[in-house]
Structures are given as structure tokens and as C-alpha cells.
Regions:
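C-terminal and inter-domain tail/linker signature
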Residues: 1-127
Length: 127
């Protein structure tokens, strides 16, 4: 399985299927989490699952794989009160996610954007 396939499967199983066993399958036990609001390792992910809105939805669009790094540009609903645009950066080692960074920004509708553009002008990939 390619690294980007690992990331897509991991995120789908954990966040869409709500399958907590995906944590053991796809994340290294002591993975490093660079988001300052989340803990490292499996326990941080397990806690996150309990905090997510039941309507949480992660829609990846642009996906880039370069060696051991996978980057996704996604639309996320249910993270907060408004949709957010997220760039996730994953480092993969031996088939597991070992490190994660992200940048999160509230979605601005085109009617309020200076250029009038969507923040996700790509075709959303449904998984």
C-alpha cells in the first residue's frame, strides 16, 4: 500500500467509520502530534474521538505524497461551529503514521472572500 493510501484508509476508518481499532492499525503507538491542542500517541487520538461531533466529516481534496510524507488539503465539517480547511502533514514509517502536523483555518465563503473564490476549488474526493 502506498503512503497516501495508508493515510486515506486510516483517516476514513477512524473518522468516518468511527473504528477506534484503526488507531492500532495505522498509527505508531508513540506517534508525535505537533498540534498544540492534542496529545501524542494513541491516547490522544482516543480522546479526540470522544470529542468529535457526530456529524464530523473529513473530505480530502488535494493529496500529495513525497517519500515518507503525505499532505492532504481538506474540508472538515463538525470540528467546530463552522467548516474548516485543513492541511494535514503526515510522516509514515514502516506502514504507520509516526508524526503529524496541521494547519487549520475557518472556511470563508466566496461571498466574503476578496477574490470571490472557494477555499477548496478542487473536486472533493468522497471516501
Amino acid at each position: 500500500m502506498k503512503n497516501k493510501e495508508i493515510v486515506l484508509k486510516a483517516m476514513n476508518d477512524l473518522f468516518h467509520e468511527k473504528d477506534s481499532s484503526a488507531i492500532e492499525r495505522y498509527w505508531q503507538k508513540d506517534y508525535i502530534q505537533h498540534n498544540p491542542t492534542m496529545a501524542n500517541g494513541h491516547e490522544g487520538l482516543k480522546k479526540l474521538l470522544t470529542l468529535l461531533d457526530v456529524n464530523f466529516k473529513w473530505e480530502p481534496g488535494i493529496i500529495v505524497e513525497e517519500n515518507d510524507i503525505v499532505i492532504t488539503h481538506s474540508l472538515v465539517n463538525g470540528w467546530g461551529t463552522v467548516p474548516v480547511i485543513v492541511v494535514d502533514i503526515f510522516r509514515i514509517k514502516e506502514g504507520k503514521i509516526v508524526e503529524h502536523w496541521d494547519v487549520v483555518q475557518e472556511e470563508t465563503p466566496p461571498s466574503k472572500a476578496v477574490g470571490g473564490n472557494l477555499m477548496t476549488s478542487f473536486n472533493q474526493k468522497k471516501i
